[in-house]
């Protein structure tokens, strides 16, 4: 007689509340653990946090904030190619060792044009150049502050006499000394022929000192990734993102283990060979192996675990997240392809478990959707502050451009869409910096309990399977909470 269990059940499916990590002998203090890890084959993070490519989670403001904390943000694709590329460019210009392609204004431009540029790029000064890009002056907001004639040429009000400049070999310490000595905030960098080649600002030097753990490229710019779908304009979108300076591209679909995604991966590797390509989402080792064999520089693991995802109940498909992460980790163990554990995280302890199961980093959505930097709308409800948060499979998000993620790009009638997500609200949480601080603290504590000095060492940790009674015992019980902690709320609160 055939057995359903013997014939059809191929694995146990466990997730975060099914297990606990077993404490081990430790010589590791939480404050001494090393959190550096890899986001993709060639991109190193200083903390293992990636913000999700969701339209209520990551745009430039979030990407800047998470990169300054040591992680990386993935800018969502629910916008035009031009707007997504612009969001990437904003991140790349937010902080620099030296700005290699500074915004400039040509001779003859008006005060109105200078003010427009300053407002668009949120900058306080613009080098003025001639037709051959020779530096002829610099105009700052101080020059424009009381100027009433908007049609007046900037040539008449810019600083041009005794301009303080430096050369490309100047390091940031020497540049800081020059800025301090001359009491200026912007230092143009020129070549031997006085062509403008860069700009060093006091603000960037200060930021670098304030955030030494920031995730930066080799030019001192914040790192940023961006999501793309599997559509006819994917390669055009990728090229625009590369031109804007993107560090990695995420091919973001609901089912990464599919022919169209693998074909798009091959096209991407041929089209932009010097950019890391991350592919997701998947839930099995077989999927991971196929993507790695076809050139993926990282894989994203998670089908249906997210708080706003309904894939598992709508489609009946998915793998509980810890089992999925471990299956993928086992398949990729002998490769140099990292995995990103995406979804299902509610507490910092879940992050520790996801990394211990094999993740190199975790993707976070709901954990940061309530922060100041998220693009979601602010909502006041019953006197409390919330922010909107929706799945990319929700009807609202699909109407704005995420239909292709769920292979419904050709569906024109909104009534014919089959959503795999919901829209809702999450409590306001303050800034990303405050949230990441608590998550880093929980991760450090967990690694200390496990005796793991690095995330790679954390992969060796062991788990114990627990019952529902064990889950209840793990949470505060038999008490009324009178003082809330910044890193804990009761389930379903």
Tell me the role of every PLM-derived stretch.
Residues 1-25, 105-106, 167, 227, ...:
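Alpha/beta catalytic cores of nucleotide-metabolism and tRNA/nucleoside-modifying enzymes
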Residues 33-45, 52-54, 83-121, 128-130, ...:
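Bateman/CBS regulatory modules and CBS-like beta-alpha motifs in cytosolic regions of diverse proteins
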Residues 44-51, 97-102, 217-227, 268-283, ...:
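Short beta-strand/loop segments at the ligand-binding rim of alpha/beta enzyme cores
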Residues 68-83, 246-258, 297-315, 345-379:
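Glycine-rich phosphate-binding active-site loops on the catalytic face of alpha/beta enzymes
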Residues 74-78, 104-105, 125-127, 165-166, ...:
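Catalytic beta/alpha-barrel core
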């Amino acid at each position: 007689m055939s057995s359903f269990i013997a014939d059809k059940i191929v694995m146990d499916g466990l997730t975060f509340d099914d297990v606990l990590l077993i404490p081990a002998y430790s010589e590791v203090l939480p404050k001494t653990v090393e959190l550096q890890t890899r986001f993709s084959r060639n991109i190193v993070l200083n903390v293992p946090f990636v913000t999700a490519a969701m339209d209520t989670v990551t745009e430039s403001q979030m990407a800047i904030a998470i990169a300054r904390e040591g992680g990386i943000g993935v800018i969502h694709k629910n916008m035009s190619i031009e707007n997504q590329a612009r969001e990437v460019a904003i991140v790349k210009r937010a902080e620099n060792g030296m700005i290699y392609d500074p915004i400039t204004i040509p001779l003859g431009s008006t005060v109105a044009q200078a003010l427009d540029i300053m407002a668009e790029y949120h900058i306080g000064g613009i080098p003025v150049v001639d037709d051959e890009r020779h530096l002829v002056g610099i105009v700052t907001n101080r020059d424009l502050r009381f100027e009433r004639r908007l049609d007046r040429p900037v040539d008449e009000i810019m600083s041009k006499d005794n301009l303080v400049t430096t050369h490309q070999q100047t390091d940031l310490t020497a540049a800081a000394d020059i800025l301090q000595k001359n009491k200026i905030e912007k230092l143009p960098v020129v070549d031997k022929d006085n062509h403008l080649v860069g700009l060093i600002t006091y603000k960037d030097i200060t930021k670098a000192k304030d955030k030494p753990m920031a995730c930066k490229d080799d030019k001192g710019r914040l790192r940023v990734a961006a999501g793309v779908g599997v559509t006819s304009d994917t390669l055009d979108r990728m090229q625009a993102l590369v031109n804007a300076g993107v560090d990695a591209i995420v091919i973001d679909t609901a089912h990464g283990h599919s022919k169209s995604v693998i074909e798009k991966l091959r096209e991407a590797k041929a089209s932009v060979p010097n950019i890391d390509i991350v592919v997701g989402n998947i839930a099995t080792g077989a999927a991971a192996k196929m993507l790695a064999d076809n050139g993926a520089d990282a894989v994203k693991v998670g089908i249906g675990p997210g708080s706003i995802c309904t894939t598992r109940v709508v489609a009946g498909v998915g793998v509980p997240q810890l089992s999925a992460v471990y299956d993928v980790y086992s398949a990729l163990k002998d490769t140099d392809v990292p995995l990103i554990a995406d979804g299902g995280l509610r507490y910092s302890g879940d992050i520790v478990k996801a990394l211990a199961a094999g993740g190199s980093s975790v993707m976070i959505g709901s954990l940061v959707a309530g922060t100041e930097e998220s693009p979601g709308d602010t909502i006041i409800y019953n006197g409390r502050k919330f922010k909107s948060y929706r799945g990319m499979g929700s009807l609202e998000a699909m109407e704005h451009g995420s239909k292709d993620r769920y292979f419904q790009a050709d569906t024109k009638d909104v009534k014919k869409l089959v959503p795999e997500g919901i829209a809702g609200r999450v409590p306001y949480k303050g800034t990303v910096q405050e949230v990441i601080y608590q998550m880093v603290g929980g991760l450090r504590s967990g690694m200390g309990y496990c005796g793991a000095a690095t995330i790679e060492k954390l992969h060796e940790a062991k788990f114990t399977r627990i019952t529902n009674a064990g889950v209840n015992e793990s949470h505060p019980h038999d008490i009324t909470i009178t003082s809330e902690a910044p890193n804990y709320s009761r389930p379903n609160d």
